[in-house]
C-alpha cells in the first residue's frame, strides 16, 4: 500500500467534502503472526483516527479461496480460523476494533448452514475475553447480509455473548469496498 498517496487522497477528499460529511483516517490491518513487528510500527507511523484488525490469511490461504477448505472438514477449517485469530489477538494490540471475527463463514462450503456459536463456544469465548481484556472493540459487519448469510458477522448470538461477558465497544462496518456497499444494510444491524 502506498500510504503517502492514500493519505494525500484522503486529505483532499476530507477538504472537498468537509461541509457534507465527516471523514476519518484509518486502515484495516491484516493480522498475521509473522507481522508481529511490522504492524505495530505501521499503526504508530501516522495519526490514524481508527484502525481495524482483521484475520484474512490463515496458513497462507484466504478462506475466500476454495483451496483453504481442501484437505480438511468445514468444521476443522472454521476452528483453524478461530485458532489463528485468537493467536493474532494475543499478539497484537495496535488497533481499535476487531473486524468480522467469523469472516471464514462467508466462504465455507455450506456457509452458515452448519455454523453456530454453540459449536465453537469455547474458542469464541476466549476470543471475546481477549478483546474485552485489551479494550478492543468488536465489529458488527453487515456484509454477512450481502453474502446471503441472513445475519451480520458475527452472528447476533455472538454479539449478545460479547455483551454478557462485559464487552462494551461495538462498532458497525460493512466491508464497503465499493460505493454501493457503504453502510450496507445498516438498518438491519440497528435492530440487533
Language model region names:
Residues 7-19, 39-52, 89-93, 126-135, ...:
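Acidic (Asp/Glu)-rich catalytic clusters
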Residues 74-112:
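Hydrophobic, aromatic-enriched interface-forming segments
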Residues 65-70, 102-115, 141:
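Short, flexible active-site loops
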Residues 23-27, 51-53, 97-99, 138-140, ...:
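Hydrophobic faces of well-ordered beta-strands that scaffold small-molecule active sites
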Residues 26-32, 56-58, 102-106, 141-145, ...:
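Active-site beta-loop-alpha junctions enriched in small/polar residues
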